[in-house]
């Protein structure tokens, strides 16, 4: 098992400009959560951008702590957060304002995501950018997909992609995060 103090974060991060972690890591064990916090704190001290994907998986939290107890402290050290409205509600109790999922008829409600972004950025003040992916499931083989980025209250929306012949949805969030990190490192304008 991983233990506090074993990893020399200053050496690991010596040439780094970005540290990304996912909510799956602290869900695995209390030691993994502690080492994740240790890494975040070291990255913060070294002025390295820290990002996370909340990526809540209820079935992984089995060591006696809730996601809310652990994730709040970890996310406080993040500059960039990706998470959907369901993860934000289950982990932090943040719900979209003036939103009734039963009245959407399965369609993506952009204002719900914007509400969650505002609330998350107000709660986690270090966070300067929040992003979400919006997936509309037309059926098991046909989805729509778009991304939204919130930067200091300004929202940028990708076009809506119509994805047909879906074989497996696994990895969409990971690929989005990789592209987002690349974009934020490469372009000076978040609209790009």
PLM regions and their residue ranges:
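Conserved phosphate/ATP/ADP-binding segment of small-molecule kinases
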Residues: 46, 60-154
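Conserved post-catalytic alpha-helical subdomain immediately downstream of the catalytic base
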Residues: 156-192
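Short strand->helix junction
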Residues: 26-29, 137, 187
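Short beta-strands and strand-loop turn motifs
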Residues: 18-25, 50-58, 85, 131-133
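Short, conserved structural micro-motifs that define repeat-unit consensus positions
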Residues: 44-50
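Conserved phosphate-binding/catalytic loop of the ribokinase/pfkB sugar-kinase fold
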Residues: 1-33
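Surface-exposed amphipathic alpha-helices with a cationic face
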Residues: 37-44, 121
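Active-site glycine-rich loop that binds ribose-phosphate moieties when present
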Residues: 2-8, 34-38, 65-70, 111-115
């Amino acid at each position: 098992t991983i233990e506090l103090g074993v990893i020399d974060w200053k050496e690991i991060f010596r040439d780094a400009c970005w540290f990304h972690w996912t909510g799956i890591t602290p869900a695995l064990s209390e030691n993994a959560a502690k080492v994740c916090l240790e890494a975040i704190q070291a990255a913060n001290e070294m002025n390295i951008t820290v990002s996370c994907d909340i990526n809540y998986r209820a079935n992984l939290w089995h060591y006696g702590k809730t996601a809310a107890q652990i994730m709040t402290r970890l996310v406080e050290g993040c500059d960039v957060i990706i998470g959907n409205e369901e993860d934000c509600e289950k982990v932090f109790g943040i719900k979209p304002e003036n939103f009734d999922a039963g009245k959407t008829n399965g369609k993506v409600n952009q204002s719900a995501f914007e509400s969650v972004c505002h609330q998350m950025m107000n709660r986690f003040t270090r966070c300067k950018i929040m992003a979400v992916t919006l997936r509309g499931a037309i059926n098991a083989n046909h989805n729509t997909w778009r991304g939204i980025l919130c930067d200091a209250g300004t929202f940028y929306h990708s076009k809506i992609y119509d994805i047909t012949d879906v074989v497996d949805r696994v990895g969409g969030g990971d690929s989005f995060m990789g592209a987002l990190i690349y974009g934020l490192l490469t372009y000076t304008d978040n609209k790009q």
